Amino acid sequence: ADVAMTPMGEHVGSGLTKSKNLLLLVAVCFIMGVLITVAEPDLTVLASQVAGIIDSTVLIFTVGIGVGLFLVIAILKIVFKKSLASILMFFYMVMFALSALVIINGNIGFLPMAYDSGGVTTGPITVPFIMALGVGIAATIGGRDAEENSFGLVALCSIGPILAVILLGIDASGTLDYQIPDYAIADHFLAATLHLLVHTAKEVLLALGLIVVFFAVLQVTVLK
């Protein structure tokens, strides 16, 4: 993270802010928010656990869009120097109201998974990038409270996936059939381990590849 995602976040944040193009800043932050979330290993694990009630791809991109939208809100908070407490209070009230609606509809078992999805924003890829992005934007904008203004981005982004998954849960049907994984050593340990490594490597390379390609295009077209 220190070698890749943190410098990338600072570079993107400062470069886009210097362009003075708010629409471009919002669009890029949304896309990067989606891509870094999709690349999170934690999200893949969560999606596999609830595949019986929600399609894994739908859940992954729903959470990604939630993070992307709230990353945009967090960035706009920095740009317009709005109160973090007021924004958090408003969206928490919305979140609890939607949670009550899920309970009324009889899908209370859906809520733990929805709130657990917020943990994706504490992953090893997402956190360094979001924090560095905020620091880069706040430092470029400047001002007496630049450091304080960049505070709270991860807290805001954690709301996005929770709200997104709760919205999925309002009309969801079925039951969560979670089974504890079998951690016993298989007879063909080497073959099983190799298969798992190859499968995981493919997922990680695909997700990180999207980030690399998007950053390369951004570097050539906007940040040059």
Report the location of each language-model feature.
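Transmembrane alpha-helix boundary signature
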Residues: 2-11, 34-46, 105-110
